[in-house]
Amino acid sequence: MENEEIPEFLSPKEEIVYWRELAKRLKQSYQEARDELIEFQEGSRELEAELETQLIQAEQRNRDLLGDNQRLKCEVDSLKEKLEHQYAQSYKQVSLLEDELVRARSIKDQLHKYVRELEQANDDLERAKRATIVSLEDFEQRLNQAIERNAFLESELDEKESLLVSVQRLKDEARDLRQELAVRERQTDGIRKSAPSSPTLDCEKTDSSVQASLSLPATPVGKISENSFTSPKGIPNGFGTTPLTPSARISALNIVGDLLRKVGALESKLAACRNFAKDQASRKSYTPANLNSSSSSVLNSSGVKYSHAGHTSFFDKGAVNGYDPPGVLGSRPPSPPGLLPLSV
């Protein structure tokens, strides 16, 4: 009410009315506050008496509680002593159990490690067993293939012996023909001296072709050996010599050319047989590891047939590519007595 603002009055009557109403309100609030004060004093006296009785009762209960508290403290002390004794015993038991647990765990770890080692060793043994079985089966298969190839090689070696005899026979025939040609040339020397010194152009060409054919080597691979057919000394054209007739020269050229082709084919076939024999012997000397590394090439070669046509087959690739295994077949078999060695 103190904070109420006094309004502005237009007339004194309004101001008088305002202050009268305000006095009535203040008087009424004063009466109400006085009644409340009287009522509060009466209630406070009653409350004070009640609180005094409650205080007396609380003091009595406090004395009882203090006695109970003292008794409970004694019981707590006795229980604490018992608890400490029990705790010490339980601590000793727990320590013993922990030590036993540590020992049991260490034994368990050792057993687990031992079991793992046994399992690993068992797995290694099983893998080694499987690998041994596979390698044994592979070795048996390759052994069977080697036996078959050896049988085939033996047949080829027999055929090679027959080819050597044929080649030697053809060489003897070629040597006889060469000697015959030399005799004929010597016989015609006297005729050539008396004949005109200007032969025809055709005779010169035929003579040069005969000399070129006679000077060809016996091997088709281009190697000149001690057993190759060498032509006699070149006959000079003209200068008082008379050449053979064209028909005789052509026939001799054809005969010698056929013989050279046959000998070349036989020597090529013989070279293929020798290379095949060397390759087979080198394959026998390989270890099982080398057999495993070359399994694909050997298996692929099982379907390739050996050719008798004078060219190298699959089994000759080692020698053709420059690979000649050392120690294979020891040394070449000696030629039969009375036969000339064949150069390859």
Curated annotation (Swiss-Prot):
Q: Where is this region: Disordered?
A: 186-209, 325-344
Query: Record's InterPro entries?
Result: NUDE, NUDE_dom
Where, if anywhere, are coiled coils annotated?
13-190
Presence of keyword GTP-binding: no
UniProt keywords, alphabetically: Coiled coil, Cytoplasm, Cytoskeleton, Microtubule, Phosphoprotein, Transport
GO biological process entries: cell migration; centrosome localization; chromosome segregation; establishment of chromosome localization; establishment of mitotic spindle orientation; lysosome localization; microtubule nucleation; mitotic centrosome separation
List the protein's name: Nuclear distribution protein nudE-like 1-B
Organism, as annotated? Xenopus laevis
